Amino acid sequence: MADTPAEYIQHHLQNLVYGSHPEKGWIIAQTPEEVKAMGFWAVHVDTLGWSLFMGLIFITLFRMAAKKAVTGVPSGLQNMAEMCIEFVQGIVKDTFHGKNPLVAPLALTIFVWVFLMNSLKWIPVDYIPGLAHAMGLPYFKIVPTADPNGTFGISLGVFLLIIFYSIKVKGVGGFTKELSFTPFNHWALIPFNLFLEIIGLLTKPLSLALRLFGNMYAGEVVFILIALLPFYVQWGLNVPWAIFHILVIPLQAFIFMVLTVVYLSAAHEDHH
């Protein structure tokens, strides 16, 4: 797959990209130069595929738990599902102060889905890329949250919900008034208020996406660097780093979920 450490690192950090090349048409990019030539609308096939696959696993597991729910002794899968639901419901109850029955299911979906995508980091870094290379694919990353396209996609969805509920709860006029007269309630400071509020609004999806991406990407880079070391050294570093990620992986999913609930709670607050 790679002859030098630099090529090895570049290979493992490059996504499988499909797009329109100005000279070759619609192709799977074989080099970083081809990826660059494809431009903004190129598709990261691995990120999209693994995101959908983890979402399907989430739906399948919770659907199975719901179908097998019994009044007697619950199964292990049912216990896991109930623990997740009760945990998320507790967070939403303490954090969200509006009235919206969709917030708790949304928070549950975000928490479990992001956790499942993060958990792909536990798969050794060479396994899936090596298998993909044997199948003729030049690149293949398996952690969707280590790709900014994946994290920005989720955070953009959250951002659209923030705007939607802000307008739905407060009305167009109320939302505009909030942007215009916060934090300083004077007409002369409306331009300054709008500047501050719009910047603050735009930083919400930005912070959500970059926080998750930064942590997952950095962890992936460390795993790749460890894989470059001699075999007898790898285990001594891989095991502690993997154990550390037992905390990092659910923590990042939790932070993403909590911030989403906090932002939606603010969107439901009517200041009239």
From Swiss-Prot:
Residues that span the membrane, as ranges: 39-59, 103-123, 124-144, 152-172, 181-201, 221-241, 242-262
One cellular-component annotation, GO: proton-transporting ATP synthase complex
Main localization category: membrane
Keywords, comma-separated and alphabetical: ATP synthesis, Cell inner membrane, Cell membrane, CF(0), Hydrogen ion transport, Ion transport, Membrane, Transmembrane, Transmembrane helix, Transport
Membrane topology reported for the UniProt record: Multi-pass membrane protein
MF-aspect GO terms: proton-transporting ATP synthase activity, rotational mechanism
One Pfam family it belongs to: ATP-synt_A
InterPro entries: ATP_syn_F0_a_bact/chloroplast (IPR045082), ATP_synth_F0_asu (IPR000568), ATP_synth_F0_asu_AS (IPR023011), F0_ATP_A_sf (IPR035908)
GO aspect biological process, one term: proton motive force-driven plasma membrane ATP synthesis
Subcellular localization: Cell inner membrane
Gene3D superfamilies, per database record: ATP synthase, F0 complex, subunit A
Subunit structure: F-type ATPases have 2 components, CF(1) - the catalytic core - and CF(0) - the membrane proton channel. CF(1) has five subunits: alpha(3), beta(3), gamma(1), delta(1), epsilon(1). CF(0) has three main subunits: a(1), b(2) and c(9-12). The alpha and beta chains form an alternating ring which encloses part of the gamma chain. CF(1) is attached to CF(0) by a central stalk formed by the gamma and epsilon chains, while a peripheral stalk is formed by the delta and b chains.
Family statement: Belongs to the ATPase A chain family.
PANTHER family associated with the record: ATP SYNTHASE SUBUNIT A, CHLOROPLASTIC
Purpose of the protein: Key component of the proton channel; it plays a direct role in the translocation of protons across the membrane.
Protein name according to UniProt: ATP synthase subunit a
